Amino acid sequence: MRKIEEKENYIAHKNKENGKIQTIKEHSENTARLCMEMSIPELKEINRIIGLLHDIGKYQNSFQRRMKDEKIRVEHSICGAQIAKKIYEKPFLALAYLMEYCIAGHHSGIPDGGVQNGRPDSLNTRLQREIGDRTVG
């Protein structure tokens, strides 16, 4: 139970001016709600899932160290895209690609699809990366 309680305090954003913190849980739930509000009815649930997954990589210990002012670069956006791919690729390949693009591109824009061993910034190449520690706790 302690691990779950600790995850509730993981930081998504910190206001540089006043130090106010937004947890990953708060941020993801707010983003999911906004994604649903801006969606057509048929895609509300898919967009909710995209909102929930988009920053799941911020649960990495390395990202939390960054939020505590450690000067390190941490890839977080690709983690949610990899999860969407794993869950949706077999039953809904086209849907999986759309979700991956939305999640992976939420900071840097939507990358080219690319081919295996293609450009380093292509979606295909990014999805094959090993990401940080992916551990929590």
Task: Name the predicted role of every residue range.
Residues 2-18, 24-137:
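Accessory nucleic-acid engagement/destabilization modules that flank
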